[in-house]
Amino acid sequence: MSEHGTGARPGDDQGTTEQGGTRLEPDQVFDLARQGADVLLDLVDAGLPVELADQAGNTLLMLAAYHGHAALTAGLAERGADVNRLNGNHQAPLAGAVFKNEPDVIRVLVEHGADPDAGTPSARATAQMFGRELPEPGAR
């Protein structure tokens, strides 16, 4: 597991899971986050660690946010995923969403307490770099 991990590592007995009786390979779990698959929330509810991270330190929330899946990002945050957890490259989910220009994901992360100054580069610096503005907490 990366230095940031608190959950099980994919491939460990506690990090593997089953979906409808079918065993999922570790990469498949991360693919569900990249694809925005709602079933991932069911897996978390059934015991999959919400802070599960890949070898690069990308959590399920980071992957969902980076790939533009606002509803999944919100669902993971509501289940306790850390919206400020940095990956192995010291990148925060909010900065990734700003970089990818994902306004719905940005709004979700800000609403769940994402720190615009977390990570390198920070979301604030990324927004300035691309001439974008970050919403204020509570703004709609």
Question: Model-predicted segments: where are they?
Answer:
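Conserved ankyrin/ankyrin-like repeat signature
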Residues: 39-40, 71-72, 104-105, 133-135
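Specific position within ankyrin or ankyrin-like helical repeats
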Residues: 32-33, 65, 98
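Ankyrin-repeat intra-repeat helix-capping/turn positions
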Residues: 35-36, 68, 101
